[in-house]
Amino acid sequence: FSQDNTILVPDPVYPVYVDDNVMAGRKILYLPATAENHFLPMPDEAPHADIVYICSPNNPTGATYSVEQLKAWVAWAKANDAVILFDAAYECFVTEKGLARSIFEVEGAKEVAIEVCSFSKIAGFTGTRCGYTIVPQALADGKLNKMWLRRQTTKFNGVAYVVQRGAEAVFTEEGMKEIQHNLDYYRQNAAVIAAALDEAGVWYC
């Protein structure tokens, strides 16, 4: 993770990926996500890069990679000595069989991938800055895990304790039931919107 790294990002995607790396002075390459590739660019279209960002389900398109598609990205990362930064913020909305909720559903991904996730989508924690990052020990012989731990303990003291307790409650039996109820409500709203767009003949992702 140096200033000289080349960064590969799908286009369109969550803009912070680009902004963060522009501020660091890194070279940015764009991988078009289009209707032709179902908004899911694959590694056979990708140039060499040191780091690739994958947001799945994607913000803003909602397109979601299957486990099989992510296998190809993991193989690409190994062949290119690259690291995948996998943003799983919207994984809680994945219900279709075969679609991935985590990059680590792919065998070997722990050797090339870092996963980040947020409580803002699954539990409505928007604004509390609470989430988690998984940096596997298998990645770069554990060096990145140690570097990340040192960085976090030096520059960040964690979110407020009351927020941590709220996040802890998310994973209780009662918390998961309540969250599932809310997610079902969101999905119903999405279905209503999709039906209205279909009726009006409006194309959407």
Map each language-model feature to its residues.
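A short helix->loop->beta-strand "cap" motif at the edges of active sites that frequently abuts
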Residues: 5, 26, 79-83, 109-111
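Conserved PLP-binding catalytic core of the aspartate aminotransferase-like
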Residues: 187, 201-205
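Conserved core segment of the aminotransferase class I/II
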Residues: 106-184, 191-197
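Structural detector of well-ordered beta-strand residues that form the stable sheet scaffold
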Residues: 8, 29, 85, 114-116, ...
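Hydrophobic alpha-helical segments in the ANL/AMP-binding
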Residues: 16-23
